[in-house]
A protein has these predicted regions:
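Conserved DEDDh/DEDDy metal-dependent 3′-5′ exonuclease domain
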Residues: 3-205, 245
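Conserved "right-hand" nucleotidyltransferase catalytic core of DNA-directed polymerases
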Residues: 2-9, 188-189, 196-424
Length: 424
């Protein structure tokens, strides 16, 4: 069905007859531009579902175009019950499929048909390779999005506001236009496919101007391996996780009691006689919790005890104060001013530990666990820095975590190697 929008004419494919006609057009073409639009399968996987998570998304649209074609195709995969003929295009090694973020397209293809695409090419990685090799992005508006690509390389701005719109319902002409422009081009431009034009231009630069064919091969192969890493995720031992949180909560309560002692707050005791021998439990007073949650009042209270300047409770500030206190030496080797310095060291050290424990306990760890796989899934970038180094990030998706920060997390429990790999 032909749809004429403000910026582009497109073919919207919703019937078997229309799909068959498209397949005839595609047959024998060696180069295609392809792109998905997805939505979160909230009905099946609940509020943790995400349109960016291959395990909990639904592929709604697939846009297709080829060189010289001014009327891109938008295939409604759901209306056609996700036809296997589309899967076969992804598997066809004789057809190069150019996608902007091919890692995501590979993941969606795996989620939809259970296969990994063959001969798929990532234009974003190509864009990043040029940026890393030349420093191009350092002097221009930063970013490697599709909008940045067509703006900076082809001088064609695109409105990307509908990227996060709801693709699960009846689609509007504006949504169809948005989808079509991911593989097409505005009718008043000099292009028919912005994606393919940018691909041809940048690849020529990479291969012939900068003579970097080996770099292209390595990074284009790498993004598929990264996609597999994202798909598989990391298994979680829930027994260890529960032990971790329980231990962290117990230590947090203990540090609240320590802070209560520093500020001379009275602590109640509860005696339990049910087990025969009396069991004494110390109860964290409410007023220490209130004080610890009031930074202004806490700063004021600490300043009354310590001979140092303190105007906030940021980690760097507290660490600086701690170093200052720790570096003060008395001539006679005794503690300064009746132990005030040592008290300050204890208070600041305990406060730093309390802040770490609070973050551990308050983090919604369950949100990181995929509701379908039971694993945690990081997001990786083949080229994540200006130097070309691989990176990990949780940006843009609350269901992902930053795998680069794992080594900076101070664990609260000692995990024996054999426990780490238990099945349960």
């Amino acid at each position: 069905m032909r749809v004429n929008t403000d910026l582009v004419d497109l073919e919207y494919i919703t019937t078997r007859e229309e799909l068959d006609a498209l397949l005839l057009e595609i047959g024998g073409r060696p180069l295609l531009a392809m792109d998905y639009e997805t939505y979160a399968d909230v009905e099946t996987w609940g509020p943790q579902a995400s349109a960016l998570d291959p395990h909990t998304l639904v592929a709604r649209l697939l846009q297709i175009n080829w060189p010289g074609n001014a009327i891109p195709y938008v295939v409604d995969l759901r209306a056609l019950d996700w036809p296997t003929e589309i899967r076969d295009i992804w598997l066809d090694s004789s057809v190069r499929k150019v996608c902007f973020n091919a890692r995501f397209e590979a993941l969606v293809t795996q989620a939809t048909w259970g296969v990994w695409p063959d001969n798929i090419y990532c234009a974003m990685v190509l864009f990043q390779q040029i940026g890393a090799a030349t420093g191009f992005k350092a002097g221009r508006t930063r970013g490697y999005s599709y909008g940045s690509l067509v703006r900076d390389i082809l001088d064609t701005p695109l409105n990307k506001e509908l990227a996060s719109s709801d693709w699960s319902g009846e689609l509007t002409p504006a949504q169809l236009q948005y989808a079509a422009l991911d593989v097409g081009a505005p009718r008043n431009s000099n292009y028919t496919s912005l994606l393919l034009e940018a691909y041809a231009l940048l690849r020529n630069e990479l291969l012939y101007t900068y003579e970097m064919p080996q770099v292209e091969d390595i990074d284009q192969a790498a993004f598929m391996e990264i996609a597999r890493m994202e798909w598989n995720g990391l298994p979680i031992n829930m027994n260890v996780m529960r032990s971790f949180l329980s231990t962290a909560q117990s230590e947090l309560d203990n540090y609240k009691l320590r802070m209560s002692a520093h500020f001379d707050f009275s602590v109640d005791q509860v005696v339990d006689w049910n087990s025969g021998a009396p069991q004494v439990t110390l109860v964290v007073p409410d007023k220490i919790t209130v004080l610890l949650n009031n930074p202004t009042a806490l700063v004021s209270r600490i300043q009354k005890l310590l001979p140092v300047e303190l105007d906030n409770l940021q980690q760097k500030t507290l660490e600086t104060v701690l170093r200052e206190l720790d570096s003060e030496d008395d001539e006679d080797g005794a503690t300064s001013e009746e132990g005030i310095r040592d008290l300050g060291i204890q208070i600041i050290s305990d406060l730093l530990r309390y802040k770490k424990l609070t973050k551990m306990v308050s983090t919604n760890w369950a949100a990181l666990i995929n509701p379908r796989t039971g694993n945690v899934h990081a997001r990786y970038q083949t080229i994540g820095t200006s130097t070309g180094r691989m990176s990990s990030s949780s940006s843009g998706d609350t269901n992902k975590f930053n795998a680069q920060q794992i080594s900076n997390v101070e664990l609260m429990v000692n995990i024996e190697e054999d426990r780490l790999f238990e099945d349960n």
